[in-house]
Amino acid sequence: VLIIAVLFLTACQLTTAETYPRGQQRHHALRSTDKNSKLTRGCTPRNGFCRYHSDCCSNFCHTWAIMCL
């Protein structure tokens, strides 16, 4: 069963490689890192309101004071 699964996945990759030449694939996988998402949505500056570490530009939210450090 494992061999069949590996062969199937290899065939899918080869088919995709033949269908879409390098750099011309229509639907790229969405890869969003925390840094990239901050560029699009902005981040909370120091002493601003936060709930999570990822809300802050510094990546540190003081949870009981509810502000970015």
Curated annotation (Swiss-Prot):
Keyword Disulfide bond among UniProt keywords: yes
Signal peptide segment: 1-17
GO MF terms held by the record: ion channel inhibitor activity; toxin activity
GO cellular component: extracellular region
Propiece residue ranges: 18-40
Broad class of where this protein is predominantly found: secreted
Places the protein is found: Secreted
Domain of life: Eukaryota
Organs and tissues of expression: Expressed by the venom duct.
Keywords assigned by UniProt, alphabetized: Disulfide bond, Knottin, Secreted, Signal, Toxin
Residue pairs linked by disulfide bridges in the UniProt entry: C43-C57, C50-C61, C56-C68
Domain text: The presence of a 'disulfide through disulfide knot' structurally defines this protein as a knottin.
Family, as annotated: Belongs to the conotoxin O1 superfamily.
Protein name from the UniProt record: Conotoxin LvVIC
